[in-house]
Regions:
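Short recognition patches in nucleic-acid-associated and regulatory proteins
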Residues: 2-15, 24-51, 57-79, 87-131
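Extended, positively charged loop/linker patches that create polyanion-binding surfaces
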Residues: 84
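Acidic, proline/glycine-rich low-complexity IDRs
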Residues: 119-158
Length: 158
């Protein structure tokens, strides 16, 4: 079974649960070092999100609305102000800054991408379907107090 895990997240997103399919996947972010604890940084009203691993310091680009999802990847809509600084997210309950990150991706599926993009534009291939997703939800769980924000980011990307 192929899941709609975007190319840039394939080495980091571990699917969890029984509900994953070609049309949606939920997973926990894990660094290549094995750590699941991250600082969360955002810019452009959470339109650009990066994670920094608390164990090894690796930066992971989680989402960039100008590059990822249908509008960013397929349409090339990049309206973001890339001069804006990143801001570190802290837990609203305890003010700590270490989180476990869960991501939910929704997709129209591979066949839709083949019909809409590959059939009409030679710049796309069949493997690109995972990058043209329609929705992303990012959930954060504070590692200090276990406070949860189930929809810290909840964005339609098409």
């Amino acid at each position: 079974m192929e899941y709609p895990i975007p190319t840039h997240l394939q080495q980091f997103l571990e699917p969890v649960g029984e509900e994953n399919s070609e049309y949606e996947v939920t997973g926990t972010v894990r660094c290549t070092c094995g750590c699941k604890n991250f600082e969360v940084w955002q810019s452009n009203e959470r339109q650009i999100i990066k994670l920094v691993c608390k164990q090894c310091g690796k930066e992971i680009q989680l989402f960039d609305a100008g590059k990822h999802g249908w509008n960013g990847f397929v349409c090339g809509d990049d309206f973001l102000d890339r001069t804006l600084p990143f801001e570190k997210h802290t837990c609203p309950d305890c003010d700590e800054d270490v989180f476990e990150v869960t991501v939910h991706i929704s997709s129209q599926g591979k066949q839709d991408f083949l019909e809409e993009c590959v059939a009409n534009d030679d710049s796309f291939s069949g493997e690109d379907w995972v990058d043209g997703f329609e929705w992303i939800t990012v959930s954060l769980t504070c590692r200090e107090c276990s406070g949860e924000d189930q929809e810290w980011v909840d964005l339609e990307t098409m």
